[in-house]
């Protein structure tokens, strides 16, 4: 009986000694009103590791000692939210932490600056971003004393949080390892000089995703590489009517967050294409990624770091910003799959029209892609590339259904049109061998099914 009582007491003592989880500030509209008269700002650092995935702990203890779960030798991701006009907790926050820790054994620090971001006065929140950055710099200097390295720090900032990340980077003279800006806030930052906003000089590598550049985000490129999914605004799947309520305002702005999370959680390769404009991208002018050498096209999201070396080379000498474009689907995980169809017509042929095509696989599945350009001229022996987007990945392709549409003013029901060579290549998975067919004869508006073969090296 005494042993039983002793064990019960031990269990009670252990449970009593367990520290409570650190909770994200739960504010409300009342706090936004209160801020009108009594402004407050506070920065709370919530630390997560694989040892405390579901229970945040303070980064520093009350005696200013470093939390024993923090590993100075591992990567540290700093996750910084943006403006919170009514004090709500970011719905994506906990899932983001989970996905990061599932990807890599790291330290994750959520920067809770809700008391400073929760206000009806947006300009006040903007001014608070610099104060938060100064506060963070104090904690970072303390971490450095414990043996942490700036090179291992990856700041992920959402909206105003992106500019906070930039201000922190400026304090440390651009020595942070990486900053990712997720739709950096545009109002009060657009067209400002680099010292007043996030800039590529703020870290050794800065990647930015623009998803609401005509609204709450910013249009101009800020990083070593700037991704513009769906042109950087009007994201598919987002409400188009103001009658949709708050989602109409924030859906596009938050899409950058969800795209980055999807890049971690799924097998999607968010292949993106370096281009001067979204218009040029849609006309298939930018399907080559030769400037990225063996790495192929850049990938949006967490894996953008793979292109750090090439991008930094492009920035040496004169700043050569890299703007890249891609399209996504409208539902999570937003995957799309790119193919390019390359066509060469014989030296005695000139065609002026358009193609449509569909793919068939060995299971009998058929899918027709979204094509980006309807009509274009096909000149003698000049390769013309047609960019195609599929919503499902297509492997084990058995047949290509091809249809040619001659321009309306040149239609000829008895004419034939020759193709010297056709090559289909996956851009999403460039390691897959391209498929080819040669010496093809077509008639206007008549579909032909072609059984392609793996291209020989001289034709690729």
Swiss-Prot record:
GO terms for biological process: lipid catabolic process; phosphatidic acid biosynthetic process. Glycans are attached at residues 63, 396. GO terms for cellular component: extracellular space; plasma membrane. It comes from the Eukaryota. Inhibited by sodium vanadate. Expressed in testis. Expressed exclusively at the connecting piece of the sperm. InterPro entries: AB_hydrolase_fold, Lipase, Lipase_LIPH, Lipase_N, TAG_lipase. Keywords: Cell membrane, Disulfide bond, Glycoprotein, Heparin-binding, Hydrolase, Lipid degradation, Lipid metabolism, Membrane, Secreted, Signal. The active site is at residues 159, 183, 253. It catalyses: 1-hexadecanoyl-2-(9Z-octadecenoyl)-sn-glycero-3-phosphate + H2O = 2-(9Z-octadecenoyl)-sn-glycero-3-phosphate + hexadecanoate + H(+). It is an enzyme of class 3 (hydrolase). Its EC number is 3.1.1.-. The keyword Transferase does not apply. Belongs to the AB hydrolase superfamily. Lipase family. Hydrolyzes specifically phosphatidic acid (PA) to produce 2-acyl lysophosphatidic acid (LPA; a potent bioactive lipid mediator) and fatty acid. Does not hydrolyze other phospholipids, like phosphatidylserine (PS), phosphatidylcholine (PC) and phosphatidylethanolamine (PE) or triacylglycerol (TG). This is Lipase member I. It comes from Homo sapiens (Human). The lineage of its organism: Eukaryota, Metazoa, Chordata, Craniata, Vertebrata.
């Amino acid at each position: 009986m005494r042993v039983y009582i002793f064990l019960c007491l031990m269990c009670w003592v252990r449970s009593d000694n367990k520290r409570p989880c650190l909770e994200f500030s739960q504010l409300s509209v009342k706090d936004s009103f209160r801020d009108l008269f009594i402004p407050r700002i506070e920065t709370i650092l919530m630390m997560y590791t694989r040892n405390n995935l579901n229970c945040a702990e303070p980064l520093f203890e009350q005696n200013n000692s470093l939390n024993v779960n923090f590993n100075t030798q591992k990567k540290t991701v700093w996750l910084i939210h943006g403006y919170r006009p009514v004090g709500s907790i970011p719905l994506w926050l906990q899932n983001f932490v989970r996905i990061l820790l599932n990807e890599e054994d790291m330290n994750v620090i959520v920067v809770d600056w809700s008391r400073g971001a929760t206000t009806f006065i947006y300009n006040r929140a903007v001014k608070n971003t610099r104060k938060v950055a100064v506060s963070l710099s104090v904690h970072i200097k303390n971490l450095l004393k414990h043996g942490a390295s700036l090179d291992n720090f990856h700041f992920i900032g959402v909206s105003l949080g992106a500019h906070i990340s930039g201000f922190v980077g400026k304090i440390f003279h651009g020595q942070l390892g990486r900053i990712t800006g997720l739709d950096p806030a545009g109002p009060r930052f657009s067209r400002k000089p680099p010292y007043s906003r996030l800039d590529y000089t703020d870290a050794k590598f800065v990647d930015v995703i623009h998803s609401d550049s005509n609204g709450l985000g910013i249009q101009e490129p800020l990083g070593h590489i700037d991704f513009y999914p769906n042109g950087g605004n009007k994201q598919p799947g987002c409400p188009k009517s103001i009658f949709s309520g708050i989602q109409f305002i924030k859906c596009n702005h938050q899409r950058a967050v969800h795209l980055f999370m999807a890049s971690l959680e799924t097998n999607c390769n968010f292949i993106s294409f370096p281009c001067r404009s979204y218009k040029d991208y849609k006309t298939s002018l930018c399907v080559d990624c030769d400037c990225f050498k063996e790495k192929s096209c850049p990938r949006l999201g967490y894996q953008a770091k793979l292109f750090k070396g090439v991008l930094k080379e492009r920035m040496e000498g004169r700043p050569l910003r890299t703007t890249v474009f891609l399209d996504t689907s409208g539902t999570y995980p937003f995957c799309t799959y790119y193919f390019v169809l390359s066509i060469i017509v014989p030296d005695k042929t000139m065609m002026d029209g358009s193609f449509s095509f569909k793919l068939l696989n060995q299971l009998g599945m058929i899918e027709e892609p979204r094509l980006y350009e309807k009509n274009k001229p096909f000149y003698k022996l000049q390769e013309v590339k047609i960019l195609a987007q599929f919503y499902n990945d297509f492997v084990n392709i058995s047949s290509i259904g091809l249809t040619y549409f001659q321009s309306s003013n040149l239609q000829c029901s008895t004419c034939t049109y020759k193709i010297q060579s056709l090559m289909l290549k996956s851009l999403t998975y460039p390691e897959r061998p391209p498929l080819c067919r040669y010496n093809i004869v077509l008639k206007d508006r008549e579909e032909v099914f072609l059984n392609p073969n793996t291209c020989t090296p001289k034709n690729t």
